């Protein structure tokens, strides 16, 4: 078998399967597997535990100005990920599919950095440190993990056990049926990245980015058809949207909703004026947060 075809099969047997699994669990929360219906569902159910937030702020006031900058970076990366907007632009958007994976990762990473900066003023010197802190101190905390992060983003692998136990939280039978595949994904991630502690999906997203950067990302242009491109596009957009909505809910809790909306208005003004880009997907999320009046500090 030629090396390029080995890479072709390798992708289909790993990242294609894992993204399908993650996306299936996410979309199982609603009857209509669309971003809009997921946003409505999550904004009604996700929240940041106020006691957890007070405890963290008592220990460390964080760096709010830096958190705001990271949040705007996350939005900028998400705009790049979604450009050009619309299902009719799928082929154009995914022409350089591996670069979209990189933009997806930096959307997630900037979102992680945002939340860490709300509760941690110490210097974070590497991506490894940030990902490990996020998983061990935020996602693994029983008080918030499935309150703020929807399945499967709430799951971590500790040893060989998936936490929280899928049977202990409110998810569909379809979602539970994909949890064994999720365990396989996280075990493979832990082995690939040589992780010593708990593994979360944010670690997997780093592995996915490394595949795009260092393996054979160029094979998308040569070998994969519309179905594979569509699956990748759907996965990246749905996952980043759900993750960032959780980060925005946490930002509304730490900053206050009006402060968050003001930051977004300034960001939007710059994006439209300088980039001629209308971030309609962000408008939708901000409108929902404002409409539902997400509880704040």
Each PLM stretch: what is its role?
Residues 1-297:
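Terminal alpha-helical segments
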């Amino acid at each position: 078998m030629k090396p390029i075809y080995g890479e072709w099969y390798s992708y289909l047997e790993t990242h294609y399967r894992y993204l399908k699994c993650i996306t299936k669990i996410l979309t199982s929360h609603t009857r209509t597997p669309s971003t809009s219906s997921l946003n409505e569902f999550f904004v009604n159910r996700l929240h940041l535990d106020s006691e957890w937030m007070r405890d963290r702020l008592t220990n460390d006031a964080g760096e709010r100005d830096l958190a705001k900058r990271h949040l705007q970076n996350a939005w900028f990366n998400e705009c790049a990920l979604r450009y050009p907007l619309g299902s009719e632009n799928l082929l154009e958007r995914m022409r350089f599919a591996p670069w979209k994976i990189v933009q997806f990762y930096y959307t997630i990473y900037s979102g992680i950095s945002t939340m860490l900066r709300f509760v941690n003023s110490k210097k974070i010197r590497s991506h490894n440190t940030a990902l490990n802190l996020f998983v061990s101190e935020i996602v693994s905390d029983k008080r918030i993990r499935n309150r703020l992060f929807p399945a499967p983003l709430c799951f971590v692998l500790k040893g060989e056990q998936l936490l929280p136990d899928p049977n202990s939280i409110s998810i569909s039978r379809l979602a539970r049926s994909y949890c064994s595949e999720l365990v396989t994904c996280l075990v493979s991630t832990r082995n690939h990245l040589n992780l010593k502690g708990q593994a979360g999906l944010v670690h997997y997203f780093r592995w996915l980015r490394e595949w795009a950067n260092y393996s054979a990302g160029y094979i998308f242009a040569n070998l994969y058809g519309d179905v594979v491109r569509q699956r990748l596009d759907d996965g990246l957009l749905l996952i980043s949207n759900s993750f960032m909505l959780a980060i925005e809910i946490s930002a509304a809790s730490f900053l206050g909703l009006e402060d968050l909306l003001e930051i977004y208005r300034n960001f939007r003004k710059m994006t439209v004026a300088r980039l001629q880009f209308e971030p309609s997907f962000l408008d939708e999320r901000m409108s929902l947060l404002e409409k539902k009046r997400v509880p704040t500090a």
